[in-house]
Amino acid sequence: MLHKLSLIIVMTCMTAYARAVDIKARLGLKTPGNPSVSYSLTSDGSKLLAGEALPVEIMQKQVQQGNETVFSVTIKARERVYFNLNFTASTGFATDHCDFYLPGFWYHKNLRSPIEAPSFKSSKSWNFREDRLSAPLSGVYDDATHQTFTVMRRLDPPQEALTPTMDGEVILSGSTSLGYLGFDNETGIAALTFGYPYQESPRRYIRKLTLAPEVVTFAKLDAGESKTVTWTIAAGKADSYGDFVRRAWIKTFDEMGVKPIVSPYTADEVKAQLCSYFRNSFVTGYPIKFNSGENISVETCKSYPTFAVGFVGRSLLNAFNQLEYGSLHQQPDLVRQGNEVIGSFEAHGFSAKGYMHDFINFEKGMPGNEEVHTIRQQSEGIYALLHYLMYERKQGRTHKALEKKIHHLLDIFVSLQKPDGSFARKFNEDGTDVDGSGGSTPSATVPLVMGYHYFKDKRYLTAARRTVDYLEQSIIARSDYFSSTLDANCEDKEAAITAATATYYMALVSSGREQRRYIGLCKRAAYFAASWYYLWDVPFAQGQMLGDLGFKSRGWGNVSVENNHIDVFVFELSHIFRWLGEKTHEPRFVQLDKVMTSSLCQLLPTPGHLCGIGKPGYYPEVVQHTTWDYGRNGKGFYNNIFAPGWTIASLWELYSPERTEKFFQSK
């Protein structure tokens, strides 16, 4: 491993908060079959020198651009070398007062995450490959002084190389554009780390809740060849950690010049192809009919006998989607299927207490009184059925029995709400808590607001207001977005999305000062949600399927700290970005909506262009864009099992931009 011997290069960053920045520089050189040798570097004008002659020449350049310093390093080989460059920039901030930010992967200290994932629980210093991050930036916020410090990589044209081994010292098999970013707190003073090519330490995060030995890679330069790597270093101020994330996201978005891709499909073409999923996944022979949506083989897409009202299955929402589409496009088979799902669910999908059955494995039979419910799945089920009931009402049809069940379930919601306005994440059939944490509370806001509009019951609006009071105080004000998803309990993008969605719904049914409050809260949550979505296209090596397909990652979202892959979880968020952008004059949100809309349909499986999926219309879920996998196949591929139920539902909502506003315009 590299020996950590370093001297200091003093570089003056003439920011608005000007001060000298201490940068420690190291060069690692490796010869095949031998341990690497590390050299500390000192600054001599434009050169970086070691205490002895080196087979390389290293030049540095500093260019002031407003309040930032652009720091470039060029390494030129005198003979063939295998090198690794490392830099550490001291912030002067005491670690105890610092929270860190690596977009889409690290928030605060990642203390909501288990010790088996990267967090301060296992180490206070980490380095990560850039493709783990939704933007190639490392930042720190000092809550004692409100000062901030960031290092951002200026990207090279994308290149990637397959690696013969994944840990230890590794000579790369070809060119890569990937460096690394991170932070170091070993001295009690926070420093940001960066370099090229990538290294990951003290551990690599290789799959869910699995840390592995570190890796340091070395890039080859032949005699006369050179490589230039550039970073932007900036200091600033922010009112809070959330404000720091907002400012960093704005700066990154502007600097990267994020633009939509050339979309391969129109919205109508996407929906027409997704209908193949509706037809091929339809399952009968059980008390409830449904579209098989989870635990499905990527290779065969064979249906599996499990039903999920929400979360990964989204069975009720997909039932409404196909019913509505079939009616509009004269496809009676889809209308029949959608009606059969909802009709059978009305008959068999509710428990004795009036809850929806969250999840049913029909091989084991119907759930009993021991069933555990989640506020998220109950909320997603009500959301789907209220859309269905409003649609039917507009067609002149009523469903009194189903309305009564939904009305009763919303009454249960009101009774479950805690004094602080929150809802338990999970609870028993008798209403007692299984997981009393309030991170999923904003899931309940949406059905409460919809129920208020549909049933004209003001109790539901009162309860919804109380959820936002909790949301503001306990989640948005603290920038503590966690535990919205059900397959992890950590910092995750879905928590920020749900917070933005909840406040969006409240804004739609309010006016004046109250509406302005909700718009402000929505915007704060939306910036945080936006930070999870890629603003750049990660590189792939030849032979990695995603790269061979020409896949571009911009607009796709990292899932959570635990699940370091990207996916199409967006649902209404894209429309919320557009709406917020127009309401608050934030053009970046409008642009991000365009990026998402153009990008998230790229992997649509169609006849003759299946994108690695067994059947047309089954949209992929676990898209592995970095050296992390859910258990199989690695970077550039999918996991072997997937849940297309929710991916289809998410894309359907993405390409149905007026659905929510039309619901509230209906009577």
Language model features: what each stretch is:
Residues 50, 62-223:
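Beta-strand/loop-rich accessory regions of lumenal/periplasmic or secreted enzymes
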Residues 316-332, 380-398, 443-457, 498-514, ...:
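Well-ordered alpha-helical scaffold segments within catalytic/enzyme domains
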